Amino acid sequence: MRRLTLLPALAIVLPPLGAQRTAPERTDAARTSTHAEVLAFLDSLVARGAGIRVGTLGTSPQGRSIPYVVAARPMVSGPAEAKRSGKPVVYIQANIHAGEVEGKEALLQVLRELTVGDLRSLLDSVIVLAVPIYNADGNEAFGPATRNRPGQNGPDVVGLRPNGQGFDLNRDYIKQDAPETRASLAFITAWDPDAWMDLHTTNGSYHGYALTWSPGLNPNRTPANAWVQDTVLEQVRARLRREGVATYPYGNFMDQTPDSLAKGWITYESGPRFGSNLMGMSRLSILSEAYSNDPFATRIASTRAFVVATLRWLAEHPAEVRAHVAATIAARPDSVLVRSAFAPPRQDTVIAEISLAAGQGSGGFARRQRTGEFRPVVMPVIDRFVGTRAEAIPTAYVLEAQWSDVVELLRRQGVVVERLGAAWTGPVAAFRLDSVNVGRQFEGHRLVSVAGSWGEARPDSLPAGTFLIPTDQRLGMVAAFVLEPASEDGYTTWNYFDRALRPRAMHPVRRLDRLPDVPRHLVP
């Protein structure tokens, strides 16, 4: 079998003579843009009267600016006017893993086309918030791709996956160690976009698709994210196939040995430490993964095609976007799934490239010898999760005043937190710890898991100044997930409660089944 032929839509879209051009466009895809070139490109669009607004999301650990772009027609003054427009507001970021470079270049192309090119009419129906070089420090850590991105098919020199502190920014959305994460969460909280897109490159298996994609994978399925998974991405996929671009749900083969491909295709983890999983708990969320074995120019074009097709689809369905986001905002589930496992597989046909052993084994991420032969294989596809432990969502959680660092995490996530203005006595439930397990070192932390259970509410006194986190709010389910002691990827996991964790003790997070009838004040 031959791989699906890429139609002319997948050629690099060259701008008109004299217009702004990206580094790959100027060099026949020989190199990727530097941080300075990205800033200069955006400045040139402003100078040309493109009708965009460029700002600074934040500053990297090494002092580089992280630019963002607002593309709207007419321009909006801020988040409130964007909401009043009724247009879907779409946040798109690239370069979170700075060696994965085509998202950055594709997003610059899309910004140019939206503002001074052939896609200008799209801004009549959608507002775009773009962050093309999210990991600015990693981008500038240029080195040979054989070292920084082994197995990626060009360019020869790229940046590094981690940020300037050595953190993987796409594992930082709960622990928030990096300034990039804190800045982007503040931006998301301010703008509250309807949809969130994150542009990547694969690391793994040899398959027959120009690009793979995923919705948020956390099993706490919101109306918005369920719609993305079941409808939006499938319709974008069909549109791209008509244009000659083959895509499929993200995953890797369990075993790349030709005779073992039928073992299955499996996605990644469900934890909200990954940005797309966190965002899928509150809005439309889409992950894009261009195929690393395709040439650089093709990967840029594939990513551009996916972004444009997604924007077109959202622009054509504004009422449905609003309805699903509104349903997500209004949802108040009575329980939260705090642990998960892969859902039972479905059977599907997946296009595999036959690969031969090259000394790295046959696992899903092993580098192997390509043959150029593609084969459709019927196999189990595991691309969803189910919950394995649910906890009831209370009326509110409470934390003693000493846990202000946890409150800062919640506030950056956009969670509303209050403080008691006076002492209160009433029924309070506590979580008894049976065991505390300290796991492996990961991303500057030792991951913690606990066993235990909630007891019956008993009379207790809460002093003035106690932090209160009501769950009847926009991000109530997110708050429940990160605060629940047994959560597989919450604040307990990431060591924020370590000093209070010991067997037979009570966890610092407690629950209320009714709000205290004393004055309460918002935490700014």
List PLM regions with ranges.
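Sec-dependent N-terminal signal peptides
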Residues: 4-13
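Structured catalytic-domain cores with a bias toward divalent-metal coordination
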Residues: 1-4, 17-524
